[in-house]
Design a protein with these regions (language model features):
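Asp-box/WD-like beta-propeller blade repeats and closely related beta-sheet repeat scaffolds
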Residues: 138-161, 166-208, 223
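Hydrophobic core register within WD40 beta-propeller blades
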Residues: 84, 155, 205, 258-261, ...
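Conserved beta-propeller blade signature
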Residues: 91-93, 161-164, 171, 213-217, ...
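C-terminal motif of bacterial Sec signal peptides marking the signal peptidase cleavage site
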Residues: 17-19
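Residue-level detector of Asp-centered blade-edge/turn motifs that repeat once per structural unit
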Residues: 87-90, 157-159, 207-211, 264-267, ...
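Surface loop/turn motifs at the tips and blade-to-blade linkers of beta-strand repeat domains
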Residues: 73-77, 143-149, 189-197, 250-254, ...
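Beta-propeller domain segments
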Residues: 22-66, 103-105, 122, 202, ...
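Blade-level signature of beta-propeller repeat domains, shared across WD40, Kelch, NHL, RCC1
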Residues: 413-435
Length: 435
């Protein structure tokens, strides 16, 4: 049996016995971030639990809720719509992809309830195009834009090409504005690490505003490097490349699972959402939104929120830990904060202008469910966060005590009219939030 699969099943099925017997004593640490003071309890202050949600689906007529806004189905009957991209012409591209488990990993997922959260199963491995030509909030055209992919996530139209980030490579294809499908031959411009226990498979993609560079997110293969750091080469990073795939370098490192990418309005500063580590207790470690500095290190796997050392990592690098950045905006522990979109549109009230909207896919490693919502982080016109994250789109949880949910938000994107789209990969719906 493949050793990686053995470790993976153990991670899903086992309990953190080391942690239960080695809880650290002492009060929480208080850490100042850009938006608030966050309290970090000692590792294993609470047990590490596995509380997977149970997806029930959306009844007819039921929808998430955003106070003061209208929420309607933009598209339904998709197959795990994971990420969204709006083309310069206003077409919506939906990446349909899912976590794929095989063999013992699949068996273990069913045993512990992981499969009931609707994150696993055959991956559609395609991109669907939605076109609302008359701008009435209902797409009239729905076509297969590109298929035969390998867990696609990041999408980009840039300099005459359509780019897609599969889990194992970045490809580009000749693109004609307004095309409803890709017909030309693709070119693989960058291989990406995806072998073995590919714990974090999403790869996002974004162009610098000046068009000279592309940025690619690559999450870690593991929780805290437990399979060996030889399996983490080129992972837990945001990579920078030229548009033809050449010139690869690490732009920022120590990011366990960076997913959302965006340049804050009013600046050329790159921001990302990061899924932090699991199995240290209910309130460790908070996911976060942070700006990225060229060459900066953000802690993984050695530390979190600056120099807070992870006790499970035995071969520490204290000099590197001293350099670890404290992230800007805490987003709650185990919320699985994924999608990121900045609002520059005309529709939402002024207080939402410039701010960040973040899709929180929801927890599995917490006693009570966290996430399962879209949150909003206010930003100044100069591109700086000004207040903590607040709930924006809620109602995804059906019964918290029973861990039942209607769906799970992931990717977010704004249409040209200023309305917000939210991909719900468990509900197989794209929601539209408008005024």
């Amino acid at each position: 049996m493949n050793r990686m699969h053995v470790w993976g099943v153990a991670g899903l099925m086992g309990s953190v016995l080391w942690g239960c017997s080695h809880a650290e004593k002492g009060p929480p640490d208080r850490v100042e971030t850009r938006t608030e003071t966050v309290e970090l309890p000692r590792p294993y202050t609470t047990d590490s639990v596995r509380k997977f949600s149970k997806v029930r689906g959306w009844p007819e007529g039921k929808a998430p809720v955003a106070e003061g806004f209208t929420v309607k189905r933009y598209a339904a009957d998709l197959v795990s719509p994971r990420n969204l991209y709006v083309t310069p012409q206003g077409d919506v591209l939906v990446a349909e992809a899912n976590t794929e488990l095989r063999g013992m990993m699949k068996f273990g997922a069913k045993l512990v309830g992981y499969a009931a959260s609707a994150r696993t199963g055959p991956s559609a491995n395609r991109i669907t195009l939605l076109r609302d030509a008359d701008h009435d909030g209902v797409p009239e055209t729905r076509t297969v834009f590109l298929e035969g992919l390998n867990q696609p996530f990041g999408m980009l139209v840039h300099a005459g090409f359509f780019y897609v980030a599969n889990t194992d490579a970045v490809w580009r294809y000749p693109y004609s504005p307004g095309a409803t499908s890709i017909t030309g031959k693709g070119e693989k411009i960058l291989d990406l690490p995806a072998g073995g226990y590919n714990n974090h498979w999403t790869r996002n993609l974004l162009a610098h505003p000046d068009g000279t560079k592309l940025y690619v997110t690559v999450g870690s293969a593991s929780n805290v490097g437990e399979h060996g750091l030889d399996n983490e080469v080129r992972r837990a990073n945001v990579l920078e490349i030229n548009p033809d795939g050449s010139g690869e370098r690490i732009f920022a490192s120590g990011l366990r699972n960076p997913v959302g990418l965006g340049f804050a309005p009013g600046s050329r500063v790159l921001w990302t959402t990061v899924n932090e580590r699991d199995e240290l207790g209910d309130e460790l470690v908070p996911d976060y939104l942070t700006h990225l500095e060229d060459g900066a290190f953000y802690g993984w796997p050695y530390s979190y929120f600056g120099a807070h050392v992870d006790p499970r990592v035995k071969e520490q690098k204290p000099e590197l830990v001293k350099q670890a950045k404290v992230p800007d905006v805490p987003l709650g522990s185990h919320t699985a904060s994924l999608g990121l979109a900045f609002n520059e549109g005309p529709m939402f009230p002024e207080r939402f202008r410039h701010g960040a909207f973040i899709g929180q896919h929801g927890s599995w490693n917490r006693s009570k469910l966290s996430g399962y919502q879209v949150v909003f982080v206010p930003f100044s016109p100069e591109g700086q966060p000004t207040a903590p994250a607040e709930p924006f789109l809620t109602g995804f949880i059906q019964n918290a005590d029973e861990r039942e949910v209607y769906g799970r938000p992931v990717g977010v994107a704004f249409l040209p009219d200023g309305s917000l789209l939210v991909a719900d990969d468990a509900g197989n719906i794209v929601w539209r939030v408008s005024r």
